[in-house]
UniProtKB/Swiss-Prot annotation:
Record function comment: Part of the ABC transporter complex PotABCD involved in spermidine/putrescine import. Responsible for energy coupling to the transport system.
Positions bound to ATP: G54, P55, S56, G57, C58, G59, K60, T61
Name the record gives this protein: Spermidine/putrescine import ATP-binding protein PotA
InterPro entries: AAA+_ATPase, ABC_SmlMolc_Importer, ABC_transporter-like_ATP-bd, ABC_transporter-like_CS, Mo/tungstate-bd_C_term_dom, NA-bd_OB-fold, P-loop_NTPase, PotA-like
Length: 377
């Protein structure tokens, strides 16, 4: 679709000329007969906050471990700061890593844990005090500098590990779900602070997470992975609004998947008829043009559905379930063909409450109904 092609050209123009911090070239990692990562190629640029996002077992942590040097690729090349990392041990790579395990020194207090790398590097004492103080303030540990890890909660221990990695100002910081032990409020606050810090110091962050909201909040770009392969690489808005395939559409937020057969095609628009006889208009992104008679899937986000309003596509439905979510209400709707539709309505205005069993119409615009094409990476 032209709007996606235009968006990707603009993104490419922004990236062009920026030095590459980490390059993965046709990287494959096998453990015996199991392929954890398959033919992965990525360019991650200097100063970029880049996330590897996917479900458990998709290969994202294995990818991070290959960049860090804890795993060697079976095939392909890992390049950091223009230098091949083949045979380079972890401690000689210009990266620091924060994994889910804290790995703190139990006999050292918070200050000394954070300062450990600086002391080994011969940083002057005054500079150590200043930088450790800044790092502790960043992760909300000011006043905890003289506590031992045994006197800290799990979340506080994770923040010490994060501060210790940041204080050395590496060229690339690798993070494997470092905020997982924090409570929800602090986690959201730390997301913004991590992003702000990354902008301030210019360090490339490569962040592994299964949390879609976390990735969307912090990332400049995201690589969505599944079964060892990259499904799509894009900025957060493009991933959400223009998913490349069904997996990305399903994994990034909620979506309604409509299956049908193409009846007509005109430009980027197509008419789809579902198995239940619904006739719907949709658009084909990525330059993909379905053929008449072709079986396709289309995706439309719940917030794009309007209950009781007009639109390109209007479907009679029955309210099956109502879920109050605070800022919005979620409606589970039963379509005439027996399919299920999910709609979200913002609770920002007075509106008649709908009840289960009530007959309603639900509408959405064709431009918000995307025919899902082939895989993109």
């Amino acid at each position: 679709m032209e709007r996606q092609n235009t968006a990707e050209r603009r993104q490419g123009a922004r990236e062009e000329g920026r030095p590459v911090a980490v390059r993965l070239q046709n990287v494959t990692k096998r453990f015996g007969d199991f392929t954890a990562v398959e033919d992965l190629s990525l360019d991650i640029h200097e100063g970029e906050f880049f996330s590897l996002l996917g479900p458990s077992g998709c290969g994202k942590t294995t990818t991070l471990r290959m960049i860090a040097g804890f795993e060697e690729p079976t095939e392909g090349e890992v390049v950091v700061a223009g230098r091949s990392m083949r045979g380079v041990p972890p401690y000689r790579r210009p990266v620091n890593t924060v994994f889910q395990s804290y790995a703190l020194f139990p006999h050292l207090d918070v200050f000394e844990n954070v300062a450990f790398g600086l002391r080994r590097a011969g940083v002057p004492k005054g500079e150590i005090s200043r930088r450790v103080g800044e790092a502790c303030a960043l992760v909300k540990l000011s006043g905890f500098e003289r506590r031992k890890p045994s006197r800290l909660s799990g979340g506080q221990q994770q923040r010490v590990a994060l501060a210790r990695a940041l204080v050395n100002r590496p060229k690339v910081l690798l993070l494997d779900e470092p905020l997982g032990a924090l409570d929800l409020k602090l986690r959201k606050q730390m997301q913004l602070e991590l992003k702000n810090l990354q902008h301030e110091v210019g360090i490339t962050f490569i962040y592994v997470t299964h949390d879609q909201e976390e990735a969307l909040t912090m990332s400049d770009r995201i690589a969505v992975m599944n079964e060892g392969r990259v499904q799509q690489v894009a900025d957060p808005a493009t991933l959400y609004e223009l998913p490349a395939n069904r997996f990305v559409a399903d994994f990034i937020g909620q979506t309604n998947i409509l299956e049908g057969t193409v009846e007509a095609v005109e430009g980027e628009r197509a008419v789809i008829r579902t198995a239940g006889g619904l006739r719907l208009e949709a658009v084909a992104p990525n330059g993909f043009r379905p053929a008449v008679g072709e079986a396709v899937e289309a995706a439309v986000r719940p917030e794009k559905l309007r209950v009781g309003e007009a639109g390109d596509n209007v479907v009679a439905a029955e309210v099956a379930e109502v879920v109050y979510l605070g800022s919005s209400t979620q409606y589970i709707l039963r379509a005439p063909d027996g399919g299920r539709l999910v709609a979200h309505r913002q609770n920002d205005r007075e509106a008649a409450a709908l009840r289960p069993g009530e007959a309603v119409s639900v509408a959405w615009d064709a431009r918000h109904c995307l025919i899902l094409g082939g895989k993109r990476g």
